[in-house]
Amino acid sequence: MTTPLTVERLSFTWPNGRPALSHCNLQIPRPGLWMLVGTNGSGKSTLLRLIADLLEPRSGRISAAGKVALVFQNPDHQLLLPSCASDLQLGLQADLSDDERRSRVAESLAQVGLGGFEERPIHTLSGGQKQRLAIAGALASDADLVLLDEPTALLDPDSQNGVLQLLWQLTHQPAAPLTALWITHRLEELQHCDGAALMEHGSMGSWQNGQQLAQRLAPLQGGRAEG
């Protein structure tokens, strides 16, 4: 099986000279839901943006087996058009026929529990529905690796749980399971992943059992890792 993501000795420094990552290594061994926690400034969000090719590393190597999509903490920052269908159209391949485009949009919406929402105005959606739509955008674009930067930080507990369950289903479906790398500041979410790691000072620790890592961090951080 091809390794979905490999990051080797990745370093990044901001224009003001402040280092964000220092020889960071990461390997996701198989499809699944993988999570990162760490304090503010530990480099988590910077790492995702480097993997998504939004930033240029100073040194190191990134190898992703397939297309990469990034889901932001606030879906309003990436949902750009008025309706659900029109927004998903942005990420589709240009050579698809009209019928194929309609089918791809409908399929992606159904996968995230928004079947029949094609003409629904985005401004009428709840926060959880908007985040599901952002995830549908990743699916519509045929992404193999989905990066999620604190996707539940702005959601109520019910919506948080719904998005978490959705990602678990997408990463463990029998046919073509996704690979997801999820940043979280909620330690309880670590109980629902295939592996979790702690980022500190621009470097990443080894993968651990998520529940065990949450239990180890809870006394230090009051049950909540800083975003």
Give the positions of each predicted feature.
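Helix N-cap at the start of a conserved alpha-helix in ABC-type nucleotide-binding domains
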Residues: 157-159
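Conserved beta-strand-loop-alpha-helix hinge in the C-terminal portion
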Residues: 203-227
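Helix-to-loop junction immediately C-terminal to a conserved catalytic motif
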Residues: 52
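Conserved ABC ATPase "signature" region
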Residues: 99-117
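A short, flexible loop at the N-terminus of ABC-type nucleotide-binding domains that lies
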Residues: 1-7, 11-23
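Catalytic Walker B motif of ABC-type/P-loop ATPase nucleotide-binding domains
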Residues: 146-150
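Conserved ABC ATPase signature
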Residues: 121-125, 129
